[in-house]
Amino acid sequence: MSRVCELTNRKKSFGNKVSHSNRKAKRIFLLNLHNVTLISNILNKKFKFRVAIRTLRTIDYKGNLDAFLLNTRTVKLSKKAQKIKRKLKKVLAKQEVELGISDA
């Protein structure tokens, strides 16, 4: 498996290890990935992801998976996350029509 966050497409990054004498040696910064199951309250479904802890902290800050997906720009999300976001928007639009809520 590649070391990529399945929600944000974040990948390993490259930089320098700098010693006390200021010598620079190339190094790789790896992600702290964990397998997690996240629950969507709107869709009433569970989704399994391999997510970076940084992303998991952001989801916790936003409140839940639904809020994270709806408040994050689509460009920053992976294809899998974009598909779930589209489903969320569809269900929310359907609920608004059923309740008779209009934007005007």
Swiss-Prot record:
What are the record keywords, sorted?
A: Ribonucleoprotein, Ribosomal protein
A single GO BP: translation
SUPFAM superfamilies according to UniProt = L28p-like
Q: Which GO terms describe its cellular component?
A: cytosolic large ribosomal subunit
* InterPro entries named in the record: Ribosomal_bL28 (IPR026569), Ribosomal_bL28/bL31-like_sf (IPR034704), Ribosomal_bL28_bact-type (IPR001383), Ribosomal_bL28_sf (IPR037147)
Q: Which GO terms describe its molecular function?
A: structural constituent of ribosome
Instruction: Name the chain's protein.
Output: Large ribosomal subunit protein bL28
Q: Which Pfam families match?
A: Ribosomal_L28
Task: Provide the gene name from the record.
Answer: rpmB
Coiled coil ranges? none
Show the NCBIfam families listed in the entry.
Answer: L28 (TIGR00009)
The entry assigns this protein to a family as follows: Belongs to the bacterial ribosomal protein bL28 family.
Gene source species: Wolbachia sp. subsp. Brugia malayi (strain TRS)
Q: Which PANTHER family match?
A: 39S RIBOSOMAL PROTEIN L28, MITOCHONDRIAL (PTHR13528), LARGE RIBOSOMAL SUBUNIT PROTEIN BL28M (PTHR13528:SF2)
